[in-house]
Amino acid sequence: MIFGISDDDLWFPNPYLGDEDGLLAVGGDLSVERLLLAYSNGIFPWYSFRDSDMCHWYCPLSRFVIFPDEIHVSHSMRTLMNKGVYDVTFNEDFHGVIRNCSQLRIDEKGAWLGPDMIEAYTRLHELGCAVSVEVWEKDSEAQGCARHLVGGLYGVVIGAVFIGESMFSLVPSASKLALIHLAQTMRVNGGRMIDCQLETPHLKSMGGRHIPYEEYMKIMRRASDRHDAPRPVQQEGRE
C-alpha cells in the first residue's frame, strides 16, 4: 500500500505497509523536520524531479549496509592510497560535492537530485546533519597547494549512523577512496553503520551486505538515543 501525505502532516506510515519495492508514501515536503524524522526511521526520499512534482519516500525491508569494521580495501586501492596522489577531506566543499553528484545524473533516466533536493540537503549541512567527503587531486605542476576536486560523497548523519546519498568520480576509484576514508574515520570515532540504500556491485565488493529492517532499526536506535553518541565523521579538515 502506498500512502499519501501532505506538507502539513509530519508523519510516516508503518514501513511494513509499503510495497514490495519499498515505496511507502508519496507527497510531503522536504523540510528539515521531515527529513530527520524519515532518516531516523530508515526512510529516504527518492523521485524523478522531471517526471513528478511529488516526493516519493522509500523504506526497503532489506537494507544494504557497510559496517566500518568490515570495509574491504583491495590491494589496488591500498597501492593507490600509499602513492599519496590524493588528499581526502571532510566538509571542505559540500556544495562542490553535491553539485558534481547532481551533474553526473542530470541526463540519467529518473534523475532525482534536482534543485529542491539540493536545497534540502544544503539546509541539513548547515545544521551539521549532512556531511561530505572530498577527494582532491594534487596539481604537481602548480606551485603552492593547488588541487582539484575529483571525487567524493555526501550523506546524512543520525547519531553514529551515516546514510549515504550519492557519490561521484571524475577519475578512477575516487569515490571508493572517499568511502574507505569515511569508514576508517567512523571506525576511529565510534561510528556504527553506513547505510548504502541500494546494492551495487561496486559497494558489494567493498563489504556491503544486506540486513533485515529490524536489525537496522536496532542499530539506529542505539546509535541515536545516546546523548553522547560520537560523531561518525570529522566535521571539517583533512583525514
Language-model-derived ranges and their functions:
Residues M1-E239:
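N-acyltransferase acceptor-side catalytic subdomain
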